[in-house]
Design a protein with these regions (language model features):
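Conserved catalytic-core segment of nucleotide-activated headgroup transferases in glycan assembly
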Residues: 60-141, 212-214
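Conserved acidic residues
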Residues: 28, 87, 163
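Active-site and donor-binding regions of nucleotide-sugar-utilizing enzymes
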Residues: 1-67
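Donor nucleotide-activated moiety binding/catalytic core segment of transferases
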Residues: 133-174
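Helix N-cap/beta->alpha junction signal
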Residues: 33-36, 131-133, 169, 214
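Catalytic binding pocket for nucleotide-activated donors in carbohydrate/polymer assembly enzymes
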Residues: 142-144, 171-223
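Acidic, amphipathic alpha-helical patches
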Residues: 20, 114, 155
Length: 223
C-alpha cells in the first residue's frame, strides 16, 4: 500500500492497495528476520503497528544458509550439471508491473542481454538464470553457459552453489546476504523503475554492492 505509481495496466493503484490490505488482514503472524523487514512489510500491507503481527524469529527457510557442508554444495552442483572449476553466477531479476508481453504476461524489459554478458566474461563462468515466478521461464536463447533454473524447487540450492549474485530490485538480496558473498546490482532501468514502476525502499547508495547499468560495467564489477 506504499506504491505511489499506476504502473500496472491491469489494475488501478487504489485497487492494488485494496488487494494488499485484504491480504494483510488474512495473515495472523509474519515471521520476521529483522526490524527493518517488519517495518516495510507493515507499510506494504497497511498493517499498522508491526509489533502486533510480526514475530522476530528469522525466516525458517534461511536456516539452511547457515548450516551446510562443502560436500552438500558439491552434490547440488552435480545435480545441476555445473562443470568442475567454473565460477557460478546467479541472476535473480524481479518483475516489472509495466512490462507485459503480447499475451498479457509479465516479461523482462529490454536493455540487458545475458548472452552478451557471458560472451564478454569468457569460458570460466556459468550463469544460473532464476526468473521471478511472475515471469516464469527465463526465455533465454540456447547457450551452453546459461542455465534456466527457474523451475528448481529450492532457491536456497541456487544460493549455495553460486559464487556471486547479480540482481536488481529483488528481495533475494536479503536472503543472499546471509551467505556474506558478493552481490552486484544491475539496474539498467533504474530511472524508470524508481519513478514509474514501484520505487525503492533503499537508496542505491545503501545497497551492499556495486551498481551497474551496462554489460561492460557489470563485467568489470564481476572481475
Amino acid at each position: 500500500c506504499d506504491i505511489e505509481t499506476d504502473s500496472d495496466p491491469r489494475q488501478t493503484r487504489s485497487h492494488m492497495h485494496r488487494r494488499y490490505r485484504a491480504k494483510g488482514k488474512k495473515v495472523t503472524f509474519f515471521p520476521s528476520p529483522s526490524p527493518y523487514y517488519s517495518e516495510k512489510i507493515a507499510s506494504a500491507f497497511a498493517i499498522g503497528d508491526p509489533s502486533v503481527k510480526f514475530v522476530a524469529s528469522g525466516y525458517p527457510r534461511n536456516d539452511k544458509l547457515f548450516h551446510y557442508t562443502s560436500e552438500e554444495i558439491q552434490k547440488k552442483k552435480e545435480a545441476l550439471h555445473i562443470p568442475e572449476g567454473k565460477k557460478v553466477l546467479l541472476y535473480t531479476p524481479t518483475w516489472r508491473d509495466s512490462s507485459l508481453d503480447e499475451n498479457g504476461a509479465f516479461s523482462l524489459p529490454d536493455g540487458f542481454d545475458v548472452n552478451v554478458l557471458m560472451d564478454m566474461l569468457g569460458s570460466d563462468y556459468i550463469l544460473l538464470f532464476r526468473a521471478h515466478h511472475q515471469i516464469g521461464a527465463a526465455k533465454v536463447k540456447d547457450n551452453p553457459v546459461i542455465y534456466d533454473v527457474s523451475d528448481v524447487e529450492s532457491v536456497n540450492d541456487l544460493y549455495l552453489v553460486s559464487d556471486l549474485m547479480i540482481t536488481d530490485y529483488s528481495s533475494t538480496m536479503f536472503d543472499y546476504a546471509n551467505l556474506m558473498r558478493p552481490m552486484v546490482f544491475h539496474m539498467y532501468d533504474a530511472d524508470s523503475y524508481e519513478q514509474d514502476v514501484r520505487g525503492l525502499y533503499l537508496s542505491p547508495e545503501e545497497l551492499p554492492g556495486p551498481i551497474t547499468k551496462t554489460e561492460q560495467e557489470l563485467v568489470d564489477a564481476i572481475h
